[in-house]
Amino acid sequence: GIPQSADNPPWDGGFTWTKDKDNRDWIAVSCEGEGARIWWPNKDHITAEGDSVRMTYTVPSNLVAIGNGKLKNIKNMGEKTSYEWFVSNPINNYNISVQIGNYVSVQDTLIKDNQTHFMNHYVLDYNKELASNFFPQSKEVIRFYEKYFGDYQWYEDGYKLVEVPYLGMEHQSAVTYGNGFSIYNGVRSKSWPMYGV
């Protein structure tokens, strides 16, 4: 089939098909309003949560596919590569997302109660240095929210921010972020959900 395109993401659901500044494919899905049925078959009801989800995305080998949860396997098949992601916690279908692009990982850790939690953020390769200086602020935001609202619920599935070509959305364990690496604008507008906490 032909996947639905998003006219005004993330408010209008579907895929965003675009190019990055180096004219390479950059793809992301948002489906919070319409539901996940617009891009994959499922029992799409707000009360229906899978107790876990395993998703495999196969993309051209020059691209990387980022999903919710933890990366379990990468299988290179020559011209294509498959990325297997696994969410071990219950998740609403509309929170499941995929982002595809020339991503690199910016890794960090959060120490809490003598446990190390990994934070693997994914950004376009030419934004790695900028993101490396920006994303450490997400630890401060998580600590703030945990102080007032309780623990982050999905440490087992990790925490990541994924750069996208729209403003972003709070997908469980794979928060999409398109705010141009400017936390101060978000703080002023009280738009902290970009951190998904």
Q: What role is predicted for each listed range?
A:
Residues 1-103, 107:
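Extended, low-hydrophobicity, Ser/Thr/Pro/Gly-biased non-transmembrane segments
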Residues 55, 84, 104-197:
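Juxtacatalytic substrate-recognition/specificity segment
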